[in-house]
């Protein structure tokens, strides 16, 4: 690959000479290739030609290197705030190779969504959708498997971007305040099926079905060779990984729609809390845990949410070097990690339990404990701000009607989910106070506890206290996953650090808190110290 020369597109007034066309297709194509190539920086031209050649030959190493390294570098150098060359310009260079042009346009529109100030125009959003349709029709509708080799990281980011652009378009079409009547008419009538939820679900389910990924995952769980159930398509890594990533895409889509039960349900073949051979893409693993943990939290399965968040945050701490070389991926993962720390803090307030010491250390260093203390004291605004920062950007499955008032409907799904969450928080906001009193005693009369909570308590307040204690019992019993491929399964367990029962007017309290295992903490610190010591000895001064 040639070095970057810093050249930009020519602005010297070149014009397209129609009279240079001879009518001979071969000569005309050669003219167009030379014309567009002359307007393009040399390193961009050679990159595109080499990229096309690598895709044609199925050279996975070169494709991955150009996708992960060269393409972002050229984007930074030449197209930081502008789009890559148009389809006609690139097509002339690569002889309009059908497969490569679809892949190029996927990167082209992805770059526009990520880099162009103001975002893509309506026609670019529509063209991107139809380009995805071309790609998925190419690989799903074919009678035989398409012999296409792409690196797993590209397949993951392709599916992830597909869902992201659906989400982005849903928010775009819900914002009517910045659109003319003509644009609304075009969105609601002419292009009503573009980026529709049915299209998205149809594509993702089709990829899952054609790859037989569910059957393959079930076979692996049962110790059976997955190739016996994979079929002609599923035995190819290309289809297999697209199927797996589509399961994660479905998890994300259902989470964005607020259907948390279905979000966990679609992952049933995947044992969420176990490592698998398919979880080698860090961004995929982190995204999966984020949406699974959030779904658990909204289903009031706090113990499962805490375990999910804790496990993945530990994984991020240990594997940062795997993705730190790619700045945009690093930024995305860091943001998602920050969101998960916020969600973990919420879960620990609503459902206190022991977590790994290194996660506790991060919570202390980032001053989460101050906010957690405010939440424990019933500060609803802190709950609200944490939720709004950390939750997904929800969307509505249906666009506003063509005759809907000219308003901004983007926040409606978010406000609905926030209301659902805050209703649950309001039911629990007094429980930390109740817990703090119960932890001080082994036996405590009901009347005395009522007087602690309200010094002017009367008999009616004692009756209300029974309701509060029943609420405490109910909220502290969660469905907790223990084993099996379904993340929806589990057994009811009490997650509180204490338990109690009431005999007549006396509360009998038992402390069930599990003592800290300090041995593991010191072993980790000793190993870290030894590793640091070895590195210091290897430094030559």
UniProtKB/Swiss-Prot annotation:
GO terms for molecular function: translation initiation factor activity. Disulfide bonds: none annotated. GO terms for biological process: formation of cytoplasmic translation initiation complex. GO terms for cellular component: eukaryotic 43S preinitiation complex; eukaryotic 48S preinitiation complex; eukaryotic translation initiation factor 3 complex. It comes from the Eukaryota. InterPro entries: eIF3l, PCI_dom, TPR-like_helical_dom_sf. It is found in: Cytoplasm. Residues 308-516 form the PCI domain. The keyword Cytoplasm applies. Component of the eukaryotic translation initiation factor 3 (eIF-3) complex. The eIF-3 complex interacts with pix. HAMAP family: eIF3l. Component of the eukaryotic translation initiation factor 3 (eIF-3) complex, which is involved in protein synthesis of a specialized repertoire of mRNAs and, together with other initiation factors, stimulates binding of mRNA and methionyl-tRNAi to the 40S ribosome. The eIF-3 complex specifically targets and initiates translation of a subset of mRNAs involved in cell proliferation. Belongs to the eIF-3 subunit L family. This is Eukaryotic translation initiation factor 3 subunit L.
